[in-house]
C-alpha cells in the first residue's frame, strides 16, 4: 500500500497566527517623516528594501505591544526579521523556478475559509482588514505565498519522509510504560541554534547565549520577551509559543523533562544536536483513549507530481489526458501502474482503507463526494494532481489502528521537522546573500 497523503493537513495553518503574520508584512509605512529607500539585502537576483523591512519592523513592534511583550533591541529585531524575509524569499524563488503556483480559484476558496474561521463573510473580512490598515489585495498575495511555502515544504521534504512498521512497533513499545502517553502539552520554547557539525567554539558561544537567556528568565523577565530577543526559532516573535502537542510528538527527552513539571515552570538548558533549548510548560491536558467507530473509505488514486522536471501545467495536462482515457474505458488500476508517481502505483494506486483526516483536505473533500465506483475530475493537492476512485465504504472500530496512526504521525512529524530544517539550511547556504543593512 502506498502513502496515504499523510500529515493531517499540509495547509492546516493556525489561522489567527497566519493572519497576524500577514498583517505584519503589510502594515503601511510610518507617516510623517520620509526616508530615502535603499537596498538592505540582495538574495540571488532579488532585493529586499529598507521600506519592506521597516514595514515589517513597525508592524512587529505593534504586535509585540499588543501582546504586552518588551521588544528586543532594534538591531536584534531588525536582524531577525531580515533573516525571516531572506528564508521566505529563497523558498519562493525555488517554487517559482519549479513552476509551483496557486490558482485564483484555490486562493479564493482559502480566503473564504479564513473569513469563516473568523466568523465573517468575505466582505466583512475585507472591511476588518481595512480597519487595521491592511490592503486586501496585498493580504491576498501574502496568502498565496503562504500556500506556496506550505506546498513547497510538502513537496521537497514531508512527502519524502517514510515511516516503517518496525519504527511504529518500536515506538509503541517504548511508550507503553509511560504514564503520560495520553498527555498533551502546550509549551513555549527558546532555541539557540547551532549546526550539528559546528566546531566547539561555535557550540560554546551558543551555550553562553542560552545561559544568558536562562539568567534573564531567572531574574523575572517574561518568557515571551526573552524568546523574542534570543530565540532562533521561527516563532520567536510569537513568544516561542507552540500549539498543543501530544507527548508522543515530543522528543523522548522533552517528554521526560515535562512529565513532572507544573504549568508555569521553566526547564534548564536542554542540549540537542541542533542547539540548546529552554522550555516553559504553559498547559497540560489528558486525552483518554476511547473506542472509536468511524466511517472509512477504500480508494485508489493516480498521482502526477509537480517537481523541478514537471511543472504544474505539465502535471495538469498529463492527469487530464489520463482522465479522458478512463472516461473512454481504460482500467484505473492499469493506468495507475503505468503512470502514477505515488508509492501505491505497483498495486494499482490502492491506498487501502482511509479514515477521516488521513489525507489532505483537497483529496478528502473530492473523495467524500464520490460514490463507490466513481472517478473524480483532476484534483490538486500539495503532492501534485490526482485522479481518485472510491472502491467501497465501511464503519469500523479503529481504536488500535488510531493508536498506530498516532505513533506514525509522531514519528513522521519528528523526521519531517528535522529534515525541513536541514533542507532549509542547505537552500539558504546555496543562495547568494549580500547584506547591506548598515548602508544608508
UniProtKB/Swiss-Prot annotation:
Keywords: Chaperone, Isomerase, Periplasm, Repeat, Rotamase, Signal. One of its GO terms (biological process) is protein folding. Residues 1-25 form the signal peptide. Coiled coil: none annotated. InterPro entries: OMP_Chaperone_SurA (IPR050280), PPIase_dom_sf (IPR046357), PPIase_PpiC (IPR000297), PPIase_PpiC_CS (IPR023058), PPIase_SurA (IPR023034), SurA_N (IPR015391), Trigger_fact/SurA_dom_sf (IPR027304). One of its GO terms (cellular component) is outer membrane-bounded periplasmic space. GO terms for molecular function: peptide binding; peptidyl-prolyl cis-trans isomerase activity; unfolded protein binding. Residues 182-283, 294-392 form the PpiC domain. It comes from the Bacteria. Its EC number is 5.2.1.8. Its main location: periplasm. Chaperone involved in the correct folding and assembly of outer membrane proteins. Recognizes specific patterns of aromatic residues and the orientation of their side chains, which are found more frequently in integral outer membrane proteins. May act in both early periplasmic and late outer membrane-associated steps of protein maturation. The PPIase activity resides only in the second parvulin domain. The N-terminal region and the C-terminal tail are necessary and sufficient for the chaperone activity of SurA. The PPIase activity is dispensable for SurA to function as a chaperone. The N-terminal region and the C-terminal tail are also required for porin recognition. HAMAP family: Chaperone_SurA (MF_01183). This is Chaperone SurA.
Amino acid at each position: 500500500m502506498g502513502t496515504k497523503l499523510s500529515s493531517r493537513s499540509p495547509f492546516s495553518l493556525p489561522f489567527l497566527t497566519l493572519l497576524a503574520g500577514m498583517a505584519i508584512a503589510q502594515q503601511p509605512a510610518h507617516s510623517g517623516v520620509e526616508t530615502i529607500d535603499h537596498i538592505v539585502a540582495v538574495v540571488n537576483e532579488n532585493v529586499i528594501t529598507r521600506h519592506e523591512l521597516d514595514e515589517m519592523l513597525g508592524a512587529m513592534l505593534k504586535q509585540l505591544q499588543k501582546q504586552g511583550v518588551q521588544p528586543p533591541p532594534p538591531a536584534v529585531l531588525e536582524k531577525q526579521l531580515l533573516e525571516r524575509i531572506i528564508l521566505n524569499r529563497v523558498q519562493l524563488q525555488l517554487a517559482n523556478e519549479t513552476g509551483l503556483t496557486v490558482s485564483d480559484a484555490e486562493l479564493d476558496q482559502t480566503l473564504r475559509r479564513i473569513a469563516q474561521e473568523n466568523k465573517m463573510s468575505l466582505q466583512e473580512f475585507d472591511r476588518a482588514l481595512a480597519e487595521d490598515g491592511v490592503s486586501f489585495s496585498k493580504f491576498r498575495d501574502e496568502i498565496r505565498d503562504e500556500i506556496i511555502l506550505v506546498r513547497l515544504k510538502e513537496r521537497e521534504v514531508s512527502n519524502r519522509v517514510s515511516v516503517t512498521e518496525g519504527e511504529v512497533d518500536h515506538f509503541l513499545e517504548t511508550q507503553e510504560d509511560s504514564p503520560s502517553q495520553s498527555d498533551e502539552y502546550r509549551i513555549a520554547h527558546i532555541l539557540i541554534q547551532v549546526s550539528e557539525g559546528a566546531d566547539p567554539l561555535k557550540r560554546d558561544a551558543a551555550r553562553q547565549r542560552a545561559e544568558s537567556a536562562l539568567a534573564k528568565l531567572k531574574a523575572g523577565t517574561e518568557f515571551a520577551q526573552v524568546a523574542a530577543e534570543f530565540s532562533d526559532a521561527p516563532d520567536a516573535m510569537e513568544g516561542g509559543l507552540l500549539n498543543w502537542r501530544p507527548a508522543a510528538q515530543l522528543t523522548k527527552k522533552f517528554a521526560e523533562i515535562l512529565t513532572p513539571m507544573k504549568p508555569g515552570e521553566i526547564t534548564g538548558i536542554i542540549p540537542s544536536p541542533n542547539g540548546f533549548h529552554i522550555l516553559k510548560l504553559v498547559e497540560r491536558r489528558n486525552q483518554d483513549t476511547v473506542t472509536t467507530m468511524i466511517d472509512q473509505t477504500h480508494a485508489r488514486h493516480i498521482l502526477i507530481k509537480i517537481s523541478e522536471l514537471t511543472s504544474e501545467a505539465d502535471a495538469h495536462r498529463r492527469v487530464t489526458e489520463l482522465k479522458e482515457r478512463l472516461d473512454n474505458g481504460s482500467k484505473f488500476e492499469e493506468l495507475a501502474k503505468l503512470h502514477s508517481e505515488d508509492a501505491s502505483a505497483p498495486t494499482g494506486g490502492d491506498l487501502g482503507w482511509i479514515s477521516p483526516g488521513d489525507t489532505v483536505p483537497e483529496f478528502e473533500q473530492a473523495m467524500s463526494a464520490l460514490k463507490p465506483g466513481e472517478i473524480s475530475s483532476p484534483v490538486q493537492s500539495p503532492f501534485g494532481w490526482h485522479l481518485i476512485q472510491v472502491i467501497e465504504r465501511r464503519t469500523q472500530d479503529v481504536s488500535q489502528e488510531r493508536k498506530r496512526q498516532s505513533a506514525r504521525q509522531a514519528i513522521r512529524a519528528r523526521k519531517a521537522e528535522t529534515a525541513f530544517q536541514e533542507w532549509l539550511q542547505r537552500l539558504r547556504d546555496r543562495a547568494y546573500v549580500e547584506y547591506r543593512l548598515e548602508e544608508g
